[in-house]
Amino acid sequence: AANPHLCGSHLVEALYLVCGERGFFYQPKGIHZZCCHKPCBIFZLZBYCN
């Protein structure tokens, strides 16, 4: 399956799912470049978990 482009609220939702109770730090610029402009995978999302 292809990795989705995640933008805006979809991106935040994905972070909640991946990070769960650990929570995450939301850096719109960095993660937006990585996941909205081009597709990112679950491991890239995990980099933003606390």
Curated annotation (Swiss-Prot):
Provide the assembly information: Heterodimer of a B chain and an A chain linked by two disulfide bonds.
Annotated organism of origin = Katsuwonus pelamis (Skipjack tuna)
Q: Which SMART domains match?
A: IlGF
Function, please? Answer: Insulin decreases blood glucose concentration. It increases cell permeability to monosaccharides, amino acids and fatty acids. It accelerates glycolysis, the pentose phosphate cycle, and glycogen synthesis in liver.
Name of the protein described by the UniProt record: Insulin
Q: Which terms does the UniProt entry file under GO BP? A: glucose metabolic process
Q: Which GO terms describe its molecular function?
A: hormone activity
Disulfide feature: 7-36, 19-49, 35-40
Main localisation, per the record? secreted
Q: Name one Pfam family in it.
A: Insulin
